[in-house]
């Protein structure tokens, strides 16, 4: 039964209630399943957690009418959000915080139980394991529990597979494999017949799927399916082979074998080691192949491939691996195991994009990042430890999250996935993946200066993705996502520099499929620690909770604006709203309210002063007089009310208020930062000179971070200030239309400078300055990049979604 409440204010201190309907489909007790259960997939049933609310994301169109629709939408939603309803806000806030706490505990229990990867069982791999004869020669099955799993898990329609998603490739492969296993041991003929009937009734769907969804053909399907048919025919299982689809599969198989010659396969680890069971009828040199075996005894973590190898060799390491898997999964076998690196790095990515990673910083570092870095190599990353085959997808994800967290990873690893200007996931692959190129494109955006391989990869992946988007070819060979077209559209329209954290989260919460997302390997499978409704519902709660606080802060900003009579200086509340939005979309956490308001008020006052003195009537002499008056008042601690400059009174009053809220005496530091900015602004009236330093100092000081002399004189700090000021100056002028060869956002000089900033912020050293301090500068620069990148209509639409549209 769904937990339903109506409110926009979802945080504890609220005294007023605004009407926004939110439906959360996880009762509080269900999350506690995760909080108390330990030990992996056998104890944690994530599919009990369903998301009842499904909606189609709105298009991310750039504004086409100067932003008028966006302004009207902002005004309309503000009116809705300001409608008062009676009672219950505090009690509701307590309930929401309890739900958030339960969700956080649930996710933390997942981290506690992370082992070799939580993955669904594959009926196909289980069937191959069930085919293994007793190694001691009894004539019976080596793994009777695997046979029992097959008997127990046939679906009502006679097939085996995922009951919630139908793929002809997947269902037919799994069903035929299970029928072969049962038939080979002459048990349960009733289930065999029922399975065969399903197979024959649905074989025609394979041809249709081969036309409409060929991009989602299972990995190695053309190899393993044809081989399985040969095994079935030896057991006198009659398979209709009259469909043209079989001719296409044979052609695909021949192409794959041509790309990976047998000599190569015997000497170099390739993806074909994942499908050795597809080599029936092929003469294999097992002495050579066993030298390519992984340390755990598997063939690149594939139970089915390893089971086939055991049948051919009686290798004890193969046997040991399969015993481990069968015991772990109570008779079943997944399509790959272990998958612990894959799981860990994708979990971090999902939590970050959903905007909830801050709750798990310690767990992410100790459980995921340190582990992924430990297994990072010069060849990149694989999906599991000690696996001799590396892939571009896991390399991209590991590289990106490790670099963003300050780990030293080399971009040279990407050279192992490039040939003649083309980047590939696995060597000798026959088709390319759109999601792999999507992750490659995302990885290239955290490049440091001089990393030419990432420059090449970025151009390649961007061109590939643009072509796929233009052709509307979104089907992928590795995963079925709820809204990949939406994810791709956002990534192409808003590159990382121009993607504000809360904007990305607002869209991704709608794009993320929760436990409905399905992965594609040799069969379809689920990764419940990567895709689940616990993350989704926690992200919704968290977003709406933060948004409610942001709306209350926006009310205080409006009150400050009106009481200070700032409209008399030629600025509007729309400018105020944008200033607050840029701050809230960048620094969104509830506990950082002081920093957020300091950012917003500082930015708006800079804009107010700059705009006021843009007037031709206000000359350079007046700017000079204004600055001198400000210095006289704050340096001599004079009474501000005695000045004729109302703007100075407003500014100093605001700085005093920020000091009071901070709880530390930062007034002199704030005044000094403003004086420094004014001295750069005064000569030419250029408000963007020194803007990054003033904004960053205001934020950092309001957070309670005071600067020591060692910090201020540190070479990296001086470089950080200089580079950030330069970028914000160029980007600010670019937005205002003051274009020159240095201020165009597409100019390579800005791109190189952004790469330098990324390196300065994300490359750690033992004697470096505070990461929090560096991240503040980076957030400010990104906000300038975003504002220069987006047109007015786009910004208005984002303001609506981030500040006034609750997630449902």
From Swiss-Prot:
Keywords: Chloroplast, Coiled coil, Lyase, Magnesium, Metal-binding, Plant defense, Plastid, Transit peptide. Mg(2+) binds at residues 391, 393. Involved in the biosynthesis of oxygen-containing labdane-type diterpenes that may be implicated in direct and indirect defense mechanisms. No activity with geranyl diphosphate or farnesyl diphosphate as substrate. The lineage of its organism: Eukaryota, Viridiplantae, Streptophyta, Embryophyta, Tracheophyta. It catalyses: (2E,6E,10E)-geranylgeranyl diphosphate + H2O = 8-hydroxycopalyl diphosphate. The keyword Transferase does not apply. The gene is CLS. Substrate binds at residues 256, 477. The Asp-Xaa-Asp-Asp (DXDD) motif is important for the catalytic activity, presumably through binding to Mg(2+). GO terms for molecular function: copal-8-ol diphosphate synthase activity; magnesium ion binding; terpene synthase activity. Residues 1-50 form a transit peptide. Its cofactor is Mg(2+). It is found in: Plastid, Chloroplast. Its EC number is 4.2.1.133. This is Copal-8-ol diphosphate hydratase, chloroplastic. It comes from the Eukaryota. GO terms for cellular component: chloroplast. Induction: Up-regulated by wounding. The keyword Cell membrane does not apply. GO terms for biological process: defense response; geranylgeranyl diphosphate metabolic process; gibberellin biosynthetic process. A motif (DXDD motif) lies at residues 391-394.
């Amino acid at each position: 039964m769904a937990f339903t409440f109506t409110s926009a204010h979802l945080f504890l201190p609220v005294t007023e209630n605004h009407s926004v309907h939110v439906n959360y489909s996880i009762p509080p007790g269900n999350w506690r399943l995760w909080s108390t259960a330990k030990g992996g997939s056998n104890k944690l049933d994530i599919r009990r957690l369903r998301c009842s609310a499904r909606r189609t994301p709105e298009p991310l169109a750039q504004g086409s009418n100067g932003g008028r629709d966006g302004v009207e939408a902002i005004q309309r939603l503000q009116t809705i959000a300001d409608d008062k309803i009676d009672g219950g806000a505090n009690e509701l806030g307590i309930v929401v915080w309890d739900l958030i706490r339960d969700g956080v505990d649930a996710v933390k229990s997942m981290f506690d139980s992370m082992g070799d990867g939580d993955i669904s069982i594959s009926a196909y791999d289980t069937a191959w394991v069930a085919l293994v004869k007793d190694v001691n020669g009894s004539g019976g099955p080596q793994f009777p529990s695997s046979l029992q799993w097959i008997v127990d898990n046939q679906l009502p329609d006679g097939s085996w597979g995922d009951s919630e998603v139908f793929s002809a490739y997947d269902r037919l492969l799994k069903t035929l494999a299970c029928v072969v296993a049962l038939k080979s041991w002459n048990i349960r003929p009733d289930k065999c017949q029922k399975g065969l009937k399903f197979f024959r009734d649905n074989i025609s769907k394979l041809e249709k799927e081969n036309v409409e969804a060929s991009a989602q053909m299972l990995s190695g399907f053309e190899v393993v399916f044809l081989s399985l048919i040969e095994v079935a025919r030896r057991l006198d299982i009659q398979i209709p082979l009259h469909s043209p689809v079989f001719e296409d599969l044979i052609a695909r198989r021949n192409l794959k074998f041509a790309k990976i010659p047998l000599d190569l396969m015997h000497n170099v680890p390739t993806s074909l080691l994942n499908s050795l069971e597809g080599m029936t009828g092929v003469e294999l040199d097992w002495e050579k192949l066993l030298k390519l075996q992984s340390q755990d005894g598997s063939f690149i973590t594939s139970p089915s491939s390893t089971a086939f190898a055991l049948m051919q060799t009686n290798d004890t390491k193969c046997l040991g691996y399969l015993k481990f898997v069968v015991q772990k999964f109570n008779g079943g076998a997944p399509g790959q195991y272990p998958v612990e690196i894959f799981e860990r790095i994708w979990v971090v990515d999902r939590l970050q994009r959903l905007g909830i990673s801050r709750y798990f910083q310690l767990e992410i570092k100790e459980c995921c990042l340190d582990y992924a870095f430990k297994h990072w190599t010069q060849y990149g990353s694989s999906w599991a430890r000690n696996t001799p085959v590396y892939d571009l997808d896991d390399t991209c994800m590991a590289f990106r999250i490790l670099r963003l967290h300050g780990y030293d990873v080399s971009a040279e690893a990407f050279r192992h996935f490039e040939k003649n200007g083309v980047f590939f996931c696995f060597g000798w692959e026959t088709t390319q993946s759109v999601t792999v190129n999507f992750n490659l494109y995302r990885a290239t955006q955290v490049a440091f200066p001089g990393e030419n391989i990432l420059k090449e990869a970025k151009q390649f992946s961007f061109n590939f993705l643009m072509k796929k988007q233009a052709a509307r070819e979104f089907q992928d060979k590795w995963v079925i996502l709820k809204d990949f077209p939406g994810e791709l559209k956002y990534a192409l329209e808003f590159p990382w520099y121009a993607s504000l954290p809360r904007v990305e989260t607002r869209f991704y919460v709608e794009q993320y499929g929760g436990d409905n997302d399905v992965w594609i390997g040799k069969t379809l499978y689920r990764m419940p620690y990567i895709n689940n409704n616990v993350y989704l519902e926690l992200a919704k709660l968290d977003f709406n909770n933060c948004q409610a606080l942001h709306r209350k802060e926006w009310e205080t900003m409006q009150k400050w604006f009106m009481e200070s009579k700032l409209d008399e200086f030629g600025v509007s509340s729309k400018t105020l709203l944008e200033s607050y939005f840029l701050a809230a979309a960048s620094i969104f956490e509830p506990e950082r309210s002081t920093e957020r308001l300091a950012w917003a008020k500082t930015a708006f006052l800079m804009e107010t002063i700059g705009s006021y003195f843009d007037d031709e009537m206000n000359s350079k002499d007046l700017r000079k007089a204004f600055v001198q008056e400000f210095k006289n008042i704050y340096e001599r601690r004079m009474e501000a009310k005695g000045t004729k400059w109302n703007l100075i009174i407003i500014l100093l009053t605001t700085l005093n208020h920020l000091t009071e809220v901070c709880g530390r005496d930062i007034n002199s530091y704030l005044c000094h930062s403003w004086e420094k900015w004014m001295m750069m602004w005064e000569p030419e009236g250029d408000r963007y000179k020194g803007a990054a330093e003033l904004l960053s100092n205001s934020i950092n000081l309001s957070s309670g971070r005071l600067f020591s002399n060692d910090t201020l004189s540190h070479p990296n700090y001086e470089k950080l200030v200089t580079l950030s000021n330069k970028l914000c100056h160029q980007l600010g002028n670019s937005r205002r239309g003051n274009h020159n060869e240095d201020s165009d956002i597409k100019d390579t000089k800005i791109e190189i400078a952004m790469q330098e900033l990324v390196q300065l912020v994300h490359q750690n050293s033992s004697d470096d300055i505070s990461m929090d301090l560096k991240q503040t500068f980076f957030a400010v620069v990104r906000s300038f990049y975003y504002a220069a990148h987006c047109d007015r209509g786009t910004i208005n639409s984002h303001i609506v979604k981030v500040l006034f549209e609750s997630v449902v």
